[in-house]
């Protein structure tokens, strides 16, 4: 976007230098990853320390959709109201701000529902809601009544924010000794989602942007339904004296 072929804010030499730095950084990270994890490849991992990385990957993808949607939508929602419905900027800002406030209720509710009804079923429900609500928002045009648009966007916000809570309700249950690492990586993918969705918005129309969110949520829903496993039984923790404690996850 900033190169001579885009906004022309950077020279071609600068662009190539940035590409080179990114490539070198990538190679260094690959080498560091191998150094840290080589022992896992060379030696068998104790049974108590094993976990399925597929579960981590699905939660990363899920949080990319839920929190990424929050970041992207709250960044453009006020301008959407101004451009589409000629709402004054103060009102548009207040409406967009109310979208963010939903987080205070919806995210804890997602965690609460996960504890009460199960992690996987809650994730399935909220992702159905995300896909459906943003598919509806993608159909909005100037003939729609503004309250209906606000209602549709609010439902999308409720489901996406509840989804963030539901994702983190499951993160500590993958492998207790790695909870911090798994939580950190999952959280990082939320920012990845925000950048990815806003990049899409920079290249396409607003309806296509909302439909992209809906389609990504639908694909993630399939992965959750087919491959995510509901935590059952017990997780283990090795105490300082070397004994193993079983912790019920249900």
At which residue positions do the language-model features occur?
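Extracytoplasmic gate region of multi-pass secondary transporters
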Residues: 1-14, 54-100
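Helix-to-loop junctions at the C-terminal end of transmembrane segments
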Residues: 106-118
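C-terminal ends and interior cores of transmembrane alpha-helices
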Residues: 128-143
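Intracellular juxtamembrane helix-capping segments at the cytosolic ends
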Residues: 161-175
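A late C-terminal transmembrane helix in Major Facilitator Superfamily
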Residues: 176-205
């Amino acid at each position: 976007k900033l190169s001579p072929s885009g906004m022309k804010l950077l020279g071609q030499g600068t662009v190539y230098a940035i590409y080179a730095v990114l490539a070198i950084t990538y190679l260094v990270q690959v080498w560091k990853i191998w150094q840290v994890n080589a022992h896992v490849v060379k030696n068998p991992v104790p049974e108590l320390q094993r976990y399925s990385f597929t579960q981590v990957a699905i939660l990363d993808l899920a949080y990319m959709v839920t929190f990424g949607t929050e970041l992207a939508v709250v960044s453009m929602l006020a301008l959407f109201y101004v451009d589409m419905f000629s709402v004054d900027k103060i009102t548009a800002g207040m409406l967009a701000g109310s979208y963010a406030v939903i987080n205070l209720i919806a995210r804890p509710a997602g965690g609460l529902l996960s504890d009460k009804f199960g992690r996987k079923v809650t994730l399935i429900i909220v992702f159905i809601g995300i896909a459906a609500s943003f598919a509806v928002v993608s159909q909005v045009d100037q003939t729609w009544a503004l309250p209906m648009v606000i209602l549709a966007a609010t439902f999308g916000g409720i489901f996406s924010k509840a989804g963030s809570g539901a994702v983190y309700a499951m993160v500590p249950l993958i492998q207790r000794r790695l909870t911090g690492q798994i939580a950190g990586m999952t959280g990082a993918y939320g920012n990845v989602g925000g950048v990815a969705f806003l990049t899409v918005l920079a290249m396409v129309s607003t309806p296509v942007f909302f439909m992209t969110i809906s389609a990504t949520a639908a694909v993630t829903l399939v992965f959750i339904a087919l491959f995510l496993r509901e935590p059952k039984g017990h997780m283990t923790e090795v105490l300082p004296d070397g004994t193993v404690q079983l912790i019920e996850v249900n």
